[in-house]
Amino acid sequence: MKLRGLYAITDSQLLSGKFLSYVEAALDGGVTLLQYRDKTSDESRRLREATELLKLCERYKTRLIINDDAELAARLGVGVHLGQTDGSLPDARALLGHKAIVGATCHGSLELAEQAKADGATYVAFGRFFNSLTKPGAPAVPLDLIAQVRARVHLPIAVIGGITLENAPQLVEHGADLLAVVHGLFGAENAQEVTRRAKAFMALL
């Protein structure tokens, strides 16, 4: 599957009070994938918000991905992104079917990426590459890993961790396909700035 562009990831705290307006602003600017990331245990709210996001994604012809919850993804008929401790990738693939997008966190490990491909991943994700507000304690990943993955794994490569419009070009130059961005997109002062940033990220790819 060809996946290339901006991979917008929601943050419920960052988007408090402006959740749908900022997400729609990003979609208006252009988003390849939108990931709903909510680590709380409020299942009813998560279902409601994910359903609202799916409606927006359908309007803008963007693919929705659910973070760490294959059952919610199956309920909505969308894709899922799994961390290394968030359940079995083969089980998620079996649950969601062969057409669904199933992404895998690989941190900084080429071996994890090779295993993810064998297990049926659609794309592999690496990071953090820069200082990250979302995962401040995560170990840094060297830029040259991207080229190694491209040579060995042959799946779309998502990169995450402190990505901004200023540092994103070097990730693209090293071979990244998907720029996974949280604060660098949604940390804007207003919705118009979110749209501007989304357009600018998409222009890099």
UniProtKB/Swiss-Prot annotation:
One of its GO terms (cellular component) is cytoplasm. 2-[(2R,5Z)-2-carboxy-4-methylthiazol-5(2H)-ylidene]ethyl phosphate binds at residues 132-134, 162. The keyword Nucleotide-binding does not apply. It holds the Pfam family TMP-TENI. It comes from the Bacteria. It is an enzyme of class 2 (transferase). Its EC number is 2.5.1.3. SUPFAM superfamilies: Thiamin phosphate synthase (SSF51391). 4-amino-2-methyl-5-(diphosphooxymethyl)pyrimidine binds at residues 35-39, 67, 105, 135. Its cofactor is Mg(2+). PANTHER family: THIAMINE-PHOSPHATE PYROPHOSPHORYLASE, THIAMINE-PHOSPHATE SYNTHASE. Belongs to the thiamine-phosphate synthase family. This is Thiamine-phosphate synthase. The gene is thiE.
